[in-house]
């Protein structure tokens, strides 16, 4: 069984093989804009990303573009520090676009190909981010479903189990009946331990 470093090397090789270089460069540009808290340049970079969607890219690459655009709208919300329904709606829309592509083309795929593996990884991150977006709207049940959808792809995806554990911790006290509170507290602990077991996979 490959160790963590071998898994990372395999993923990086798969990602660079499957995802077009122009899209990989754009992903890095978005990351740098967020690190620099450069909100002014994010909207024009989103327009560049949207223009790439009309290109003849493979499905995984288009999933990555939608994922990056969704993250950019999330980053705008975080940098500006204000609740923006407009940004949140666009974030939800692009995450859903990425996941629609995954569910239509790869959901039942049993292939071990590089493209399927990359699509699964983008889908896990998209489900997790979608769960966090719904959590921001206090739509806890839908958010729980999103985190669990990510874990159905791989229960080693620690970002999903970590966020699910945190959400269940917040959701448990909202229950009226004691046994319901206990149920969600136990579920919270279960996913916390799962995160601990897979913490090497945290990003």
Label the model's feature ranges.
Residues 37-40, 77, 138:
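Residue-level detector of the short coil/turn that links helix A to helix B
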Residues 47-50, 89, 96, 103, ...:
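Alpha-solenoid helical repeat scaffolds
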Residues 45, 91, 143, 180-182, ...:
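Single-residue signature of alpha-solenoid repeat helices
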Residues 62, 105, 123, 157, ...:
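Residue-level recognition of tetratricopeptide repeat
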Residues 31-34, 64-75, 121-136, 159-170:
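Conserved alpha-helical positions within TPR/SEL1-like repeat arrays
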Residues 51-54, 100, 107, 151-152, ...:
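Conserved structural position within tetratricopeptide repeats
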Residues 19-20, 60, 64-67, 114, ...:
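Residue signature of alpha-solenoid helical repeat architecture, marking inter-repeat boundaries
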């Amino acid at each position: 069984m490959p160790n963590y470093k071998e898994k990372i090397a395999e993923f990086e090789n798969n990602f660079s093989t499957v995802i077009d270089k122009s899209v990989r460069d754009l992903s890095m540009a978005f990351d740098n804009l967020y690190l620099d808290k450069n909100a002014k340049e994010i909207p024009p970079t989103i327009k560049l990303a949207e223009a790439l969607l009309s290109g003849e890219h493979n499905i995984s690459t288009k999933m990555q573009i939608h994922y990056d655009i969704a993250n950019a709208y999330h980053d705008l919300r975080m940098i500006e520090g204000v609740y923006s329904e407009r940004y949140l709606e666009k974030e939800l829309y692009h995450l859903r676009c990425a996941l629609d592509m995954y569910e239509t083309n790869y959901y039942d795929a049993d292939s071990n190909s590089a493209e399927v593996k990359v699509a699964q990884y983008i889908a896990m991150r998209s489900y997790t981010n979608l769960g966090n977006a719904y959590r921001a709207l206090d739509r806890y049940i839908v958010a729980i479903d999103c985190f669990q959808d990510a874990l159905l792809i791989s229960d080693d995806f620690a970002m999903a189990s970590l966020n699910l554990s945190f959400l269940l911790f917040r959701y448990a006290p909202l229950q009226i009946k004691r046994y319901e509170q206990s149920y969600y507290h136990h579920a919270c602990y279960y996913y916390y331990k799962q995160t601990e077991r897979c913490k090497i996979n945290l990003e």
